Amino acid sequence: MSLTYRDAGVDIDEGDRLVELIKPHARPTLRPEVLAGIGGFGGLFALDVKKYREPVLVSGTDGVGTKLKVAFAANRHDTIGIDLVAMCVNDVAVVGAEPLFFLDYFGTGKLSAEQGAEVVKGIAEGCRQAGCALIGGETAELPGFYAPGEYDLAGFAVGCVERSRIVDGKGVAPGDVVVGVASTGLHSNGYSLARKALMDRHPLDRRFDGLGGRTLGEALLEPTRIYAKDVLALLDAVPVKAFSHITGGGLPGNVPRTLPDGTRAVLEEKRWPRPAIFDLVEREGGVPRDEMYRTFNMGLGLVAVVAPGDEAAAHAALRARGLDAWTVGQIEVGTGEATCEVVR
């Protein structure tokens, strides 16, 4: 009796079919610098160095955590790829870099070309929103490694910034203004807690007041906002001193990452509205407010620090991008390492 790779659980033909299904999604994301499309051994990108005096490449990698479990439970796979791109390119953008290209890893126990194509459709949409090219990726079929119908994702983004325009927070000083930019919801962090608080108690098709008519599942799967073009537009308008992408660790864990020692950010909770999904998690799960702030973005997906004289121009630039933003606090003198405090 002969044994084939398919008998062992790996279907090469299904993988080839997936490649053909994703090409139409990836093709529109390609930039002029891309020299080869999906399917080669490596993605080729010819950086236009003439645009820079001293180019610096910026890289980022991330996943979407257990938000995937919500996608599995809802059997919806066409937006989770947007989250994957967002988690990577937002990190690249907040140092001032333009995202250039993106690669993904998709691992599953039994490959479904249709399911994989839905995921990549979302990845391609995320790349379109970020203005970067989807130039490659890896699909791994790992029999017995994942539960049926489940998969894992990882993303990798590369951008470029002029060395003199790197946003590193070194110029932040007491008296500077903290501007918070609205998130779309939970984004892609804290889902282990959110699932425990909500999905262990309620079905995904339940509707709660405050969710804008959406079901619980729809609210939990709301894609992460991709701020890449917003960041670049804001930098064209004002000299932003620091950016923070608010991910795991929330405001207290992320804002200090780009502040110099001897400073602290003091944010006032009353200065910005909090989307209803956060109140729902807090109420249904009995989650302490401090834990909420240590886990979730609490309505602010991006934070920028600007000089007081640039505050109005910063708000105007963000409004022009269709974003809600608020002056949420200020920088004060601190002691030792930088900190962030949310005052209620």
Swiss-Prot record:
Its EC number is 6.3.3.1. GO terms for biological process: 'de novo' IMP biosynthetic process; adenine biosynthetic process. It catalyses: 2-formamido-N(1)-(5-O-phospho-beta-D-ribosyl)acetamidine + ATP = 5-amino-1-(5-phospho-beta-D-ribosyl)imidazole + ADP + phosphate + H(+). Pfam families: AIRS, AIRS_C. It comes from the Bacteria. It is an enzyme of class 6 (ligase). Signal peptide: none annotated. GO terms for cellular component: cytosol. Keywords: ATP-binding, Cytoplasm, Ligase, Nucleotide-binding, Purine biosynthesis. SUPFAM superfamilies: PurM C-terminal domain-like, PurM N-terminal domain-like. GO terms for molecular function: ATP binding; phosphoribosylamine-glycine ligase activity; phosphoribosylformylglycinamidine cyclo-ligase activity. It is found in: Cytoplasm. Pathway: Purine metabolism; IMP biosynthesis via de novo pathway; 5-amino-1-(5-phospho-D-ribosyl)imidazole from N(2)-formyl-N(1)-(5-phospho-D-ribosyl)glycinamide: step 2/2. NCBIfam families: purM. Belongs to the AIR synthase family. This is Phosphoribosylformylglycinamidine cyclo-ligase. The gene is purM.
